[in-house]
Amino acid sequence: MKTLIINIKELLQVRDNHIDKVSGTEMGVLPKIDDAFLLIEDNLIANFGSMSNCPTIKTDQTIDAKGKIVLPTWCDSHTHIVYAGNRIQEFVDRIKGLSYEEIANRGGGILNSAKNLNQTSEEDIYNQSKVRLEEIMQQGTGAVEIKSGYGLTVDGEIKMLRVIKKLAANYPIKIKATFLGAHAFPSEYKENHADYINLIVNEMLPKIAAEKLADYIDVFLETGYFSVQETEKIIEAGKKYGLIPKIHVNQFTAIGGIKSCVKHEALSVDHLEIVTNEDIENLKGSKTMPVALPSCSYFISIPYTPARKMIAAGLPLALATDYNPGTTPSGNMNFVVATACIKMKMTPEEAINAATINGAYAMGISQTHGSITKGKSANIIITKPLTTYYEMAYSFTSNLIENVFIEGKII
């Protein structure tokens, strides 16, 4: 099937050659073509350019995008959208003054989600999760990483990962699965960390590998959760099964986690609300992508990732939602992009780069997603008529998306 989109006001994120990511000052450059066309053949980008060079060919569908912006779909590299129930009461508790840590110490937080999940059938979890997945697709997300981590038992973690696998099989959106058994210590292991880590290493990982349920491995490396040493043991065990690390780190404290993650060649380090000068030096020249989660900072009123400091140091940066029931019950990447501009002082160019090509890198798919490049997946957003692409951040609560293509088809 051939689809030709013509008269595009601004075609964004055009890259003639494949690139993995953009860093530092390059993040402020967003290549675009004004008055452009885009040709989709089957599920791939076949051609693009200025309307003056638009080919005269027979197509199955022609779309006039006069006045509209076209760009790649968002690549959301950090989510927890497979879960059961909600944590609305904790939302009210925070309003009344309780901290994240205080809620967790009272049996809330991750352990609350684990309790809900383990009491819910796999079918019910799938049915709840697919609604969230369909919603984020309509909001322009064309690739998503989904974590386990609300099982915290062998059966619970396997159940979550099977749901993720089923979602990937039933929907056109690109899905990457991450095993996050080390999300928190279950209450019965609170005083016996070694036994829970052994459960992850000796029972969870072999079963996950046998069913090929995960691409990545994650750990919540944070004070009160998993230490650097505990994290390293889990990372090393995961690597034996081919699982690449993508790590939660520096959300509340800096305890040397980033240095460890870089040493172990983590694909990404995520959260980074607290970043030291030493952390920045450790990230320089590495293959590890820093990932900011601004809607989490917004929702639970914690600091924002210091994007300006990191970009000025020459680092790359990706943006993701952290969609989860406790601290970010939203998967709207449009809000993430706008919040990055408003609260983190990223330019629209930087934010769009962070949410497309760098987001693709942070989930290992930048060779097929994240830019308008010949041969890449035809995952694109067509906006409503706009004055400029800056409006995508400026009109931060408006739905500016008219159509979303995933794998060459309007969803």
Swiss-Prot record:
**What InterPro entries does the database record attribute to this sequence?**
Amidohydro-rel, HutI, Metal-dep_hydrolase_composite, Metal_Hydrolase
Q: What residues bind N-formimidoyl-L-glutamate, as annotated?
A: Y150, N324, G326
Query: Record's superkingdom?
Result: Bacteria
Tell me the disulfide pairings in this chain: none
**Where would you say this protein principally sits, based on its record?**
cytoplasm
Q: Where does 4-imidazolone-5-propanoate bind?
A: R87, Y150, H183, Q251, T327
- Which HAMAP family does the annotation name? HutI
Summarize the protein's role: Catalyzes the hydrolytic cleavage of the carbon-nitrogen bond in imidazolone-5-propanoate to yield N-formimidoyl-L-glutamate. It is the third step in the universal histidine degradation pathway.
The record lists Fe(3+) as bound by H78, H80, H248, D322
Which pathway is this protein engaged in?
Amino-acid degradation; L-histidine degradation into L-glutamate; N-formimidoyl-L-glutamate from L-histidine: step 3/3
What do the Gene Ontology cellular component annotations say?
Answer: cytoplasm
Residues engaged in binding Zn(2+): H78, H80, H248, D322
Identify one Pfam family in the record: Amidohydro_1
Q: How is the cofactor bound?
A: Binds 1 zinc or iron ion per subunit.
User: Which controlled-vocabulary keywords does the entry list?
Assistant: Cytoplasm, Histidine metabolism, Hydrolase, Iron, Metal-binding, Zinc
Q: What's the gene?
A: hutI
Q: Which reaction does it catalyse?
A: 4-imidazolone-5-propanoate + H2O = N-formimidoyl-L-glutamate
Q: Does the keyword tRNA-binding apply?
A: no
Q: Which family does it belong to?
A: Belongs to the metallo-dependent hydrolases superfamily. HutI family.
GO molecular-function terms, A-Z: imidazolonepropionase activity; iron ion binding; zinc ion binding
Q: What is this protein called?
A: Imidazolonepropionase
The UniProt entry's GO biological process terms, in alphabetical order, are: L-histidine catabolic process to glutamate and formamide; L-histidine catabolic process to glutamate and formate
| Taxonomic source organism | Flavobacterium psychrophilum (strain ATCC 49511 / DSM 21280 / CIP 103535 / JIP02/86)
Task: Give the Enzyme Commission number.
Answer: 3.5.2.7
Give the cofactors, semicolon-separated: Zn(2+); Fe(3+)
Name where it's found.
Answer: Cytoplasm
